[in-house]
Amino acid sequence: MPSTRDIRRRIKSVKNTAQITKAMQMVASAKMRKAQQAALAGRPYATLMNEVMAAATAGAGEFQHPLAEKREVKKRALIIISTDKGLCGALNTNLLREAAKVPPATTVYVVAGRKAAQWVARTKRELVAEFSFKDSPQFAEARAISKFAQELFLSGQVDAVDVVFTNYINTLTQKAEVRPLLPMGRIKKLEANLSGPGTSEDLQPGSASEFSFEPAAGQLLGNLLPHYLNFQVYQVLLEAKASEHSARMVAMKSATDNAKQLIKDLTLEYNKLRQANITKELLEITSAAMAMGN
């Protein structure tokens, strides 16, 4: 049985841990709000961009573009968007479990985030590029990833490019998913609003009558495709950061709550042990007094 000194030492240790997790919770909460606002603010633009792309595709007729060329998939590139740090619950575990479903023998890996890089190295998979991005992702960072993916596809090194990331749904819910990027015909249409994640469905040619294109839709589409891909990657980075900070805030709150409960339990155990020691001492004193009286 532990002594009162051991319990006091453990209570002090847990209190110190609770202070750390509480501070991390507050930092994550501040970052979470900013990241969530950025992710949600980008969704209306992403939705409108899809509508424009669908309308331009309808107006372009038989449109041909190197980024839309469909080939037999012999080699695939998988872009993994992970976190740099841990302490965010099962977020990275779920993400990498989804990435592991892609057959590694026919896949090369592009990573953004240290956790993904460590996983690729640990599992001895083929890494072709590693990127990093800030807590507030910049469009230039997304463009660098997108440009590299386009170069892989256009050079014929890969026949398809997918991205696996954690999609932000709400503060308590984040979902790891694989989204196709190239060829462009495999892009998903995202219908989203500011209050929810939206739904994904295949991008289909829309009604060109809603838009008037100058110059011709085909010419515009050729210039629009690279920007469209850049923004898709940028939105993925925003969703990943919103998911990371939300998961970390929830994890740190849970850790703080658990620490507080543990402190209560230890304090109760300490008081019981202290009371037992006092009772034992009183009994010894009483027994000694009675023995001396006799």
State where each predicted segment sits.
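C-terminal beta-strand-loop-alpha-helix "lid" module of Rossmann-like NAD(P)-dependent dehydrogenases
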Residues: 1-294
